[in-house]
A protein has these predicted regions:
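Short beta-strand/turn micro-motifs at beta-sheet edges
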Residues: 2-8
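Short glycine-/aliphatic-rich beta-strand segments at the starts of folded cytosolic domains
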Residues: 9-29
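Short amphipathic alpha-helix segments
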Residues: 28-49
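A common structural junction motif
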Residues: 40, 80-90
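RNA-recognition motif
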Residues: 52-59
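Short, low-order "capping/linker" segments at domain edges
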Residues: 101-115
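Helix N-cap motif at beta-to-alpha junctions
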Residues: 66-73
Length: 115
């Protein structure tokens, strides 16, 4: 009896860096989380938990989300599809992906993105 080799493997993680453009003001974590939740439901009809989506770091304009590695493309699509946060029109530009928070922070934010 052969088992598929990917069974029992723990999920691998990806972190995606992004920048909110098109507006001067910064946003709250909860407003960005809400926009991500709504967009995920709108596009895929699923919950953010299904993709492992979590806002890990965010400073009002720049942030980092977590997802399971098999959903990296979908996660990027969700971020880039968001065009409103609250009542503000925005664009979200993804700036990099990595398997660790530390290397994404170094590569995409010069190590400056705090919790």
């Amino acid at each position: 009896l052969l088992l598929a080799s990917n069974q029992n493997k723990k999920p691998r993680h990806r972190y995606i860096g992004f920048i909110i453009t098109g507006v001067e003001k910064g946003f709250s974590r909860s407003a960005v989380n809400k926009a991500i939740r709504e967009e995920t439901l709108k596009i895929f009809g699923k919950k953010t938990e299904d993709f492992g989506l979590k806002l890990i770091r965010f400073n009002g304009k720049e942030g980092m989300i977590h997802c399971f590695h098999i959903y990296k493309t979908e996660a990027i699509h969700i971020l880039q599809s968001i065009n409103k946060i609250g009542k503000e029109n925005v664009r979200i530009k993804t700036v990099g992906t990595s398997g660790t928070i530390k290397s994404l922070n170094k590569k995409s934010f010069k190590g400056k993105l705090e919790r």
